[in-house]
Amino acid sequence: MSVELWQQCVELLRDELPAQQFNTWIRPLQVEAEGDELRVYAPNRFVLDWVNEKYLGRLLELLGENGSGIAPALSLLIGSRRSSAPRAAPNAPVSAAVAASLAQTQAHKTAPAAAVEPVAVAAAEPVLVETSSRDSFDAMAEPAAAPPSGGGRAEQRTVQVEGALKHTSYLNRTFTFDTFVEGKSNQLARAAAWQVADNPKHGYNPLFLYGGVGLGKTHLMHAVGNHLLKKNPNAKVVYLHSERFVADMVKALQLNAINEFKRFYRSVDALLIDDIQFFARKERSQEEFFHTFNALLEGGQQVILTSDRYPKEIEGLEERLKSRFGWGLTVAVEPPELETRVAILMKKADQAKVELPHDAAFFIAQRIRSNVRELEGALKRVIAHSHFMGRDITIELIRESLKDLLALQDKLVSVDNIQRTVAEYYKIKISDLLSKRRSRSVARPRQVAMALSKELTNHSLPEIGDMFGGRDHTTVLHACRKINELKESDADIREDYKNLLRTLTT
């Protein structure tokens, strides 16, 4: 089987998948032909497992359809093709359970120099891979200090390092996997975080979560830390903001205690650093973190990082750091879709022991779209207003409680703004959107703009039609239905719509 056939099928799969999914899971794969067998290499176990579960079946179908008509023999492996410089796989025992009709792979512990872990895949169906569990981290830290007497939400952990360097880090005990609301927008990030929490040191190192503010990155990071401590209360799990790392380093330099600083940060079992983008243009901090990062990975200790953008897009960050951040798994956290926003509101109301009617939650979720933090803030205002006024939560009460916020949202997301944003995105004129032109290059953006207007504003279909050159409301309805269909079948439209939605609501 030729590598060219594989590339052809990958391009076909690209058309079927959202760009984020393709770039995260399919693009990193490498391939080489070995006789009649095709060998596909994944950079780590997590990518291998996910590709095997989610995409392998479709890839085999495409290979069969575009080749000889027979599904080919194919092997999934961890590592790099032999024509590339291999990178050593982490020390991790891996076991595979394969159905009787499939080739068996013995559980084994990867030697430090090994670059490949093969998992045989038969032509008939995808192989089922199960990752074995490992013991939790070794105890390397002082036991966690008792929580504040008032039952505070943050767990204080204070460690005194000989040489006068004292570090205190916090894990919010309410940020757990149980309190995290999962949806399409954060499914991949949640799955990756759980794998790290349940099986640390298994190759997803570092785990890099990126996305806008208030989307749940910090929640997931705390959830991992809390789970690790639940498994081993004596584990040294250090969570901190990147600015805290810088401050500790400066203090260590002032106290002439840099060696103690290094010893402390390089002795942790798991280092969780939030907002890594704040290292940008801090050369001394980047230098120290570079060596700390290397020491932790060489020692098999877990590193989890978050940022507001993709690592390679962080300006002022050294290329060697960007490269190392890509050694593990990088996952985006997207703004929550409507259903997830409703679920978040219902869960928060339940935690607060407040009755929130579903239509009220839907009303808030429709209008607060940017991030979870703003969503929770809006709910708190509504609950407070309900308590002070002695009234049940209704849509009328929500309008009163969020009067200024809703007015601001309506002002920010207007049909005029949508038309301008869509025209700029597709590089056409606003007048084209309002014209009678029916060429695809104009008609499709017009339909997208109409669908966005229906979703993001409170205008009726006839009102939207009037603002698009005096069109009938049935034209707007057809446009909305067409775009909803295309979002399911056309990856480009789906990506365009998501990008425009993000631009208009953040």
Swiss-Prot record:
InterPro entries xrefs: AAA+_ATPase (IPR003593), Chromosome_initiator_DnaA (IPR001957), Chromosome_initiator_DnaA-like (IPR020591), Chromosome_initiator_DnaA_CS (IPR018312), DnaA_C (IPR013159), DnaA_dom (IPR013317), DnaA_N_dom (IPR024633), DnaA_N_sf (IPR038454)
Principal localisation: cytoplasm
Location of region: Disordered: 135-154
CC terms in the record's Gene Ontology section: cytoplasm; plasma membrane
GO molecular function, one term: ATP hydrolysis activity
Region (Domain II) residue spans: 87-169
Amino acids binding ATP: 214, 216-218
One Pfam entry name: Bac_DnaA
SMART domains referenced in this protein's UniProt entry, alphabetically: AAA, Bac_DnaA_C
Region feature (Domain I, interacts with DnaA modulators): 1-87
Biased composition (Low complexity): 139-148
Compartment list: Cytoplasm
Region: Domain IV, binds dsDNA, residue numbers: 387-506
UniProt keyword Plastid, yes or no: no
Record CDD domains: AAA, Bac_DnaA_C
Region: Domain III, AAA+ region, residue numbers: 170-386
Keywords, alphabetical: ATP-binding, Cytoplasm, DNA replication, DNA-binding, Lipid-binding, Nucleotide-binding
GO biological process terms, semicolon-separated: DNA replication initiation; regulation of DNA replication
Comment on protein domains: Domain I is involved in oligomerization and binding regulators, domain II is flexibile and of varying length in different bacteria, domain III forms the AAA+ region, while domain IV binds dsDNA.
NCBIfam families on file: DnaA
Assembly mode: Oligomerizes as a right-handed, spiral filament on DNA at oriC.
Family: Belongs to the DnaA family.
Functional summary from the UniProt entry: Plays an essential role in the initiation and regulation of chromosomal replication. ATP-DnaA binds to the origin of replication (oriC) to initiate formation of the DNA replication initiation complex once per cell cycle. Binds the DnaA box (a 9 base pair repeat at the origin) and separates the double-stranded (ds)DNA. Forms a right-handed helical filament on oriC DNA; dsDNA binds to the exterior of the filament while single-stranded (ss)DNA is stabiized in the filament's interior. Non-cooperatively binds DnaA boxes in the minimal plasmid RK2 replication origin (oriV). In vitro in the presence of plasmid RK2-derived TrfA and E.coli protein HU, forms an open complex at oriV. This complex was not however competent for formation of a pre-priming complex with E.coli DnaB and DnaC. Broad host range plasmid RK2 requires not only DnaA for replication but also TrfA and host factors.
Protein name: Chromosomal replication initiator protein DnaA
Species of origin: Pseudomonas putida (strain ATCC 47054 / DSM 6125 / CFBP 8728 / NCIMB 11950 / KT2440)
Lineage of source species: Bacteria, Pseudomonadati, Pseudomonadota, Gammaproteobacteria, Pseudomonadales
